[in-house]
């Protein structure tokens, strides 16, 4: 599966939801539903409300995102 068509954006986690899902507010003001990527889940990287994250959006569904990086 090619990941060439993803859109990377910065955002801030505003709410924790069940099953490692988060509500993320992007820099442009949109709020999306984000889930943790597999590598972050595998390495037990914790995410809390207020954390700055990098998300990947697919052009097919702009309301969902994959969290790929948590800023320190």
Swiss-Prot record:
Superkingdom, taxonomy of origin: Bacteria
GO molecular function: ribosome binding; rRNA binding; translation initiation factor activity
Residues annotated as signal peptide: none
Keyword terms of this UniProt record: Cytoplasm, Initiation factor, Protein biosynthesis, RNA-binding, rRNA-binding
Protein name (database record): Translation initiation factor IF-1 2
Annotated organism of origin: Burkholderia mallei (strain ATCC 23344)
InterPro entries the record matches: NA-bd_OB-fold, RNA-binding_domain_S1_IF1, S1_domain, TIF_IF1
Record's subcellular location: Cytoplasm
């Amino acid at each position: 599966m090619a990941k060439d068509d993803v859109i990377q954006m910065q955002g801030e986690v505003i709410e924790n939801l069940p099953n490692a899902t988060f509500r993320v507010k992007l820099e442009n003001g949109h709020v999306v539903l984000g889930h943790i990527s597999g590598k972050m889940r595998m390495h037990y990287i914790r995410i809390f409300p207020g954390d700055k994250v990098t998300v990947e959006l697919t052009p097919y569904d702009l309301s969902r995102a994959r969290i790929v990086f948590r800023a320190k």
